[in-house]
Every structure is written in structure tokens, then in C-alpha cells.
Amino acid sequence: MRKVIGIGETVLDIIFKDNKPVEAVPGGSTFNAIISLGRCGVNASFISEAGNDRVGDYIIKFLRENGVNADNVSTFPDSKSPVSLAFLNTKNDAEYIFYKDHPHDQLEFTYPDIQPDDIVIFSSYYAVNPVIRPQVLGLLDYARSHGAIIYYDVNYRPAHKDDVIRITPNLLENLDYADIVRGSNEDFATLYKKDEADKVYNAEISFYCKQFIYTQGSQPVEVRGGKDFKKSYPVHNTSIVSTIGAGDNFNAGFIFGMLKYGITRDDLLRGLTEEQWDKAINCGLNFSADCCKDIFNYVSREFGEQMKG
């Protein structure tokens, strides 16, 4: 059975509507994707750090309750759980304030068992943070040498716009390791001041990675697969309660689609067929739509049970 290994931050998301807190849920970009995959019966594990506090204990318990292996989530004596405040606007899109001590990030883990065509997902500032770069790079190198598929969600927030020059070498290295790159229009506006899929792909991505997914909220998903493949996919119409986990769950769905339809690293190196793209993107859109129906950051347990079938 193929496995999915995620590496990323853990955060407690406190969600506000009309400036009042309405929910507090465990979060983090890769974390959200891994929880959704766990709910869908995928063999999933997570590598991270959690605070040495009640929130950290809750996050580790939450991973395990959702079928995710949390053996590589470390706690350190002086670490505190990071918090993000997510303020939902009238469209139920979120604006964030992060309370996280990035310079004191720590990461210790034993390399998990990785077999050919297992999938490693990583994302966000965590993926480029210089403080933990040696450990993240070590995992990418290990995954590549063992034949894994590497899925990189750029997910670069405007809060870090002043760090772009400093993290660019790590960003480029990530793009080079990746078999698939996904990013949003907001990510690339922050990084490159570019706001069209073709401009981003041709100028910034295609030299490093041929398989590219460009999401833009409620607008169509743009896919570029080398010189030969280009397609737009309309987003599913759904009632939206929160978009906080939309992109993370698109990642989960796309990865679920790769597993379900037997898409391998060799397929990616050759370039996916239109049918393969169609199936995997549709899974991504289904996961994203389900997540947006509620205030939580992941697909519902009911959706997960349906996917297991």
C-alpha cells in the first residue's frame, strides 16, 4: 500500500466571524491535507514539532484519532504551540495574523520508511525556513533517492513578503526537487509580482518542474504539463462557510487521486495524460468543495467514509 508522508508546521487556528471567535481547530497547511487523507483511509504520517503544552498534546491526539501516524511529531521542553487568528470576511475568505516563533523552530525525526511511488508533501514558510533547512532538505534528498513523488505546495503568505530574497535559494531548490508544484495566484503575486498562470509557469517554474497547478480561489484551476498540456478546470459551485482549508484539501484530493488511479513517478516524468489530469484534478476539487462546506480545515468524516468505499 502506497504511503503519504507530510512535513510541516502545527498551528492552532482560532477562527473569527464578525470579529468574534467561533471555533478553534488544529491546523497547518500540510497538517490539514494529511488529516483529510487519514480520514479517507490513506496510510499517512506526519513529521513536525508540537508545543510542549495542552495545545500540542491535543494536536498529537487529533492526528492519531484521524488515523495519522504521529510518531515523528516531536515536542521540546521550551516549545510553545503557535497560534493563528483567521478572520473570515463577507465572502468567507480568511485574513490571517500569525503568532509563531520561526527563529526557534526545531525539527528532529527518524527517516520514515519510504518506497518508490510513495508521496511526500511539504509546503508554506516551513518548506523554506532557513532554521530547519538542513532537516527538510535531508528528507527531500532521502525521498528522492527512494523513488518517492514529491508534491510541493508553495503557499507563501504575504506576511513573509519581506523575506523573499532571503528564502529564494531554498525556494528554487524546492522547485527543483518537486515532481508537482502547486501554488495560488496570491503566492506568486507575493513572490514574483506575477498574476497569470502562463507568466508564472514560463518564467519561474517550468525550468525546474514541468507539472504545475495554479489555483485562484473561485476562478478556474490552471494546469500546465510541459509544452504539450494546458487546461483550465472550473471550480465546483458549493455553499461556502470557510475557505481556510480549500487549497490544503485540494492538495489532499489530488494526492488521493494519484493513489486511486495509480499515477506513478514514471507517469509524472513522462507527463500525465489528459485523462490522468482530469481524474486527479476532479478529486482535488471534490475535497476542496467538501472542506469549504464547514468551519473546519479538513474534509468531513462522512466524506472520508465515502472515499474509503
Place the predicted regions along the sequence by residue.
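Conserved N-terminal subdomain of the carbohydrate kinase-like
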Residues: 43-124, 307-309
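Glycine-rich phosphate/adenosyl-contacting loop at the front of the ribokinase-like
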Residues: 1-69
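Active-site metal-binding loops of divalent metal-dependent hydrolases
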Residues: 10, 29, 125, 154, ...
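Anion (oxyanion) recognition and catalysis
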Residues: 38, 64, 141-145, 175, ...
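Structural alpha-helical scaffold elements that stabilize or flank donor/cofactor-binding regions
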Residues: 113, 171-174, 205
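Short, well-ordered alpha-helix to beta-strand connector turns
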Residues: 116-118, 147, 178, 209
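Conserved beta-alpha-beta core of the PfkB/ribokinase-like small-molecule kinase fold
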Residues: 128-199, 219-220
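Conserved phosphate-binding/catalytic region of the ribokinase-like
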Residues: 2, 195-309
